[in-house]
Amino acid sequence: MSSKKKTKPVLPPGPVMVDVAGTTLTKDEKRRLRNPLVGGVILFARNFTDRRQLCALTRAIHKARKEPLLIAVDHEGGRVQRFRDDGFTALPPMQELGKLWDRDPLAAMRLATEAGYVLAAELRACGVDLSFTPVLDLDYGVSKVIGNRAFHHDARVVTMLSRALTQGLALAGMAACGKHFPGHGFVGADSHHEIPVDPRPLARILKDDAAPYAWLGDLVMPAVMPAHVIYPKVDAQPAGFSRRWVSEILRERLGYDGVVFSDDLTMEGASVAGDILARAEAALGAGCDMVLVCRPDLADELLDRLQVQHPAASVERIRRLLPRFAAPDWDTLQNDSRYQHARRLQSQIVSG
């Protein structure tokens, strides 16, 4: 009788990113993560009680497959920061950096880089690979869901500050994901609960809102997330389900070759595409590399029904998002002078 230990098969990252319910993995979740269609896990505030628990959870997720799954989180600063206690730095809303730009552009650039570094260094010390940041939407003073998450109303300022922030992310070994292509800032409706409609023509959107994506490209911004917003003068489908937006405009016209994530397919803004299978098929058919499904019951339904061959190009793009070097643990990070300085700067801008 053979005594050889069974080895896990090497599965490439699949096209579906799922969530987990709590602070540890259940048996059902471990089974779900072994599904070949799964390529990543998104974490939320409910998955965090303290750093020790978070590190244990991310280790368990990474160990679920021989080729580790991508672990992501929405951790932008301001009101969208999933981990807030047990040593995590309170990061400013990005609008504060835009206000600083109006007074002192160089200081704003420096602080943006330091914000990106602190954000990424702390997440990576706890085993998180990617934050869905920065927000590239322009601040028109209309969208409550975007609001102070946006850097500025000027596309040039948004581009410069987001570039500086991504440099900070890169210093800690983390990639960036710009959102929400081609722009969510012009509409008041919240795509979590409604289906926003932006009536502007394509030329206006490309000139203003989409300009940061064109200027930054995939070398600076290796991932992008489209908006669950309908632009009827361009396509009847929300951008994330639109081949015109993802394949023709983003990939071909703007020459973008990074990862395209769908936004959460369980949001109300995605309901126009149909049930969960129809939503996933529409997003992948439009050119997305990975779809987010942030409800376990719908994730299981999708994994049971979805039949798709993940393109080799998508697999390679997703692999490029994984960190390229090991991160220092939390205690080592706390003793790093660069980190200490960057953290003090964030505290100053948060406290005003």
Curated annotation (Swiss-Prot):
Site (Important for catalytic activity): 190
Superkingdom of origin organism: Bacteria
Residue runs in coiled coils: none
SUPFAM superfamilies reported for this sequence: (Trans)glycosidases
Pathway(s) of this molecule: Cell wall biogenesis; peptidoglycan recycling
The keyword Cell wall biogenesis/degradation appears for this protein: yes
Coarse class of the protein's main subcellular location: cytoplasm
Family: Belongs to the glycosyl hydrolase 3 family. NagZ subfamily.
Protein name: Beta-hexosaminidase
Organism: Bordetella pertussis (strain Tohama I / ATCC BAA-589 / NCTC 13251)
